[in-house]
Amino acid sequence: MYSMYSSFKAFGVLLRLGVALFLPLLGGGCGYERLEDRACPPEGTALRWEPFGKEYLRRYCQGCHAEGARAEGHGVPAGYDFGTHEVVLARRERIFARAAGSNTTMPPGPYDPPAEEREKLAEWLACGAP
């Protein structure tokens, strides 16, 4: 029984990971926005890691993208634990491609950020995620 449960759990993790990784490819260019195409406003941004970035990631991302999430079976690839500003800076382009502005493949599920929050995330990332 244990091996069957483990197999189903592994299949579920792989299925979620596959959908998360390949769903953007199915849409082609429809709605996909790139970080390099989004300009920081001329006046810059008032958004900062604390409180905006850290709180946004805690609320919408760290349920899966946090230290220990992989151990809980979420299937998050190594290097995508968004608990520190340094990791977020290193993954800025990828975060933008999946969750900012008109990009809505992350987070999966019913707890999507409102469009206004995604726009703030886009601005923050486009301005270098200060």
Per-segment meaning from a language model:
Residues G28-P130:
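Aromatic- and Gly/Pro-enriched helix-to-coil junctions and flexible linker segments
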Residues M1-G28:
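Sec-dependent bacterial lipoprotein signal peptides
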